[in-house]
Amino acid sequence: MEGDMPERINLLRVGEGILLARDLDLFYGQNMYFMNKDVYTLKAEVIEVKDKPSHPVGKIAVDAFGHTPEYVDRGIRRRALLGIGKVDYGSIDEIFPRDKGIEVIGASSDHTILDIEDAERDLKLGDIVEFDIDYASIVYLTNCRNVQIVFV
């Protein structure tokens, strides 16, 4: 980053910079405008669409991953459930919907919950939602037996 390399270093890991070009921009302020940031795509199928309360009914407890989810009460909202979950991609903080107006609001091991109230397209059962992903998600996804990897 600063133009110099210690004499004894003989291996430089630049995987994320070449594959995604996210970290250099996000953490180090390096402008990576010339790099494609959409070379990996996570696609997940919508398996349910319903209007539901934005705040769960009942008591909120610790989930299977040791976290207590927090929800903002925004009234009844349109929700979509995807047939993919944390065991497939890691954390919801590491997947980024490409469709404007879609927000990832939660996930279990096997499912992901989206708020689609403000989505630009009308999602229906069987539709595919695309996500940009970060390096950690690539690690999970490429090691998951449930995920089909397609090279284009």
Language model features with spans:
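Active-site anion/phosphate-binding pocket segments in diverse small-molecule metabolic enzymes
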Residues: 1-152
